[in-house]
A protein has these predicted regions:
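The conserved phosphate-sensing helix
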Residues: 150-177
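Walker A/P-loop nucleotide-binding motif
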Residues: 1-11
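Conserved small helical "lid"/interfacial subdomain of P-loop NTPases
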Residues: 105-154, 164
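Short, amphipathic alpha-helical interaction segments positioned at domain boundaries
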Residues: 278-300
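Sensor-1/coupling segment of RecA-like P-loop NTPase cores
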Residues: 55-97, 104-108, 112-115
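Conserved P-loop NTPase "ATPase switch" module shared by AAA+ and STAND
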Residues: 23-67, 84-86
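Short amphipathic alpha-helical interaction segments
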Residues: 245-261, 266, 277
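Winged-helix-like regulatory helical subdomains adjacent to P-loop NTPase cores
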Residues: 170, 174-250
Length: 300
């Protein structure tokens, strides 16, 4: 699935509901040592779920042997039956490691109608229609009614959201929330009525904020770090020197620059990831520099 969409959590819930065995990824030591013990202990006699395949390899000469062995056993049926979850960027890389086609499913990208239903589902507890207006002009951008079926046809705002996010609902929702305001912004325009309609609530949408910018100095090096973070679904900082042609001190400097620019940062699990604010512009830059992209960024 696309980054931020919660595919791993969904598979965890699925495993609990159907009594499947949850398989944890190998440790970093096991990955680098190509320790087959992780695979030898596989629960082949029961349904299993591996929700995070992206955590089972490293883009390193010694970090892909274990995933090759995994695919070999999987294709031969020696691992039994199970469900595998994988980040879309990692999957793009792994398809180069193991080019034999494997059946894969992904959620359909969110288009404008689906985004409308998503926004409606988040607003249901208010039990009031919501009128979203432009924070400067006061013009209605979109009105969300009581019924999820009463979605506006060809709404330009939702169509643009779907296109900008490439169907990633987490990205679309982040951008939407980032623009929300409780009060309109000062404007010289006249004739707009800022008052709430009877029975509805008004919220304001500001212009899309400026994107974070990749530092111009050592630009290619920063892009290599960002791409590596995407391919692995996030990484601990200590692993970067093993995956990139830079010493530890330089990797730490690059991460500090990316963090300062709002492009990446550490999560609660200690792994560094591309930030939500930076995901879209980073993907655009990587596309322009001919980096390997996931299916969603290549499409269209």
């Amino acid at each position: 699935g696309q980054p931020g969409t919660g595919m791993g959590q969904a598979l965890d819930i699925l495993a609990g509901r159907y009594g499947a065995t949850r398989v944890s990824p190998p440790s970093i030591r096991q990955i680098l040592a190509a320790d087959s013990g992780w695979l030898d202990d596989w629960p082949t006699d029961s349904l299993w779920v591996l929700p995070d395949l992206e955590a089972c390899f490293l883009r390193h000469v010694q970090g892909i042997s274990i995933i090759r062995d995994f695919f070999d056993r999987l294709a031969s049926g020696r691992l039994g039956k199970g469900i595998i979850g994988c980040d879309s960027w990692a999957w793009a890389y792994l398809q180069m490691i193991w080019p034999v086609p494997l059946p894969a499913l992904t959620l359909q990208p969110f288009d404008a109608p689906r985004l409308y239903r998503l926004l409606h589902s988040l607003l249901l507890p208010t039990a009031r229609p919501v009128d979203f207006r432009h924070a400067v002009t006061g013009k209605t951008v979109i009105a969300i009614s009581d019924s999820p079926e009463q979605q506006p046809a060809d709404n330009a705002e939702l169509i643009n959201m779907a296109a900008q996010s490439r169907g990633n609902p987490a990205q679309a929702l982040y951008q939407w929330r980032n623009r929300l305001r409780t009060e309109p912004e000062p404007s010289d325009e006249k004739g707009q009525d800022p008052k709430e309609s009877a029975g509805s609530k008004t919220l304001w949408l500001a212009d899309t904020p400026d994107d974070p910018v990749v530092p111009s100095s050592s630009r290619e090096e920063h892009l290599l770090v960002l791409h590596t973070l995407l391919l692995h679904g996030g990484l601990e900082a200590t692993l970067l020197p093993q995956l990139l042609p830079f010493p530890d001190s330089h990797c730490q400097w690059l991460l500090a620059r990316l963090h300062q620019a709002g492009l990446a940062g550490p999560g609660r699990d200690g792994k560094w990831r591309v930030s939500e604010a930076a995901y879209r512009p980073v993907c655009q830059i990587l596309r322009g520099h001919q980096f390997l992209l996931d299916h969603f960024q290549r499409a269209g």
